[in-house]
Amino acid sequence: TIHQGSLIDTPDGNEWWTIMQQDVGCLGRFPNLQPVKWTDDWPIVGNKGVPYETTNKPVTGAATKRQPLPTNDNFRSYPLGMQWQWNHNPDNSAWSLLERPGWLRLRTSATVSRLTQARNMLTQRIYAFEKSASMGTIRLDVSKLQEGDYAGICIFLDPYSMLAVRVKDRQKQLVWRQDTLRVHDNFTPSERAEAVEIGDVIYLRATIS
């Protein structure tokens, strides 16, 4: 659903638009720009009330260029790009972009029992594409993991799924886990772990559709 927005007109006064929130469930709310037509003094959004998936941009009164994201995901610049956000207030003593240029270094700042308690979880918003999957791929250096440490990738929804490398009994394991953020009826957490030969660097990928 799309709701909770504001009406705006273009500088030339010939077009009306609305910026609204699109509720996509567990993926959150996305800003959504839709054209507006007036019928009998009532604003009609999109195509007779149905939002457009794509449409021409508003007339802004000036030439505009397509603006990609101002930064990329390679961790080669400081500070972090605007597409990143911490899930909690971070422990700034336990992460760095400067100690190893081109890498985000994370240290274990505390031992916790649940993923939701991990402070230095760096996230990006998942985009709800209708016809293609959203995908994230990470490159991890796990050479310095200590007993009990986890490092990996997660689709942080409710329920969530994670794929990680952990050290247990001085051996690296590849772990997949699905669990909930809150108590849900008729849900049983699942976990699979397998001891595998892992070098210093591993690639992990998560996909959601």
Predicted segments with their positions:
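Carbohydrate-active catalytic/glycan-binding domains of CAZyme proteins
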Residues: T1-S209
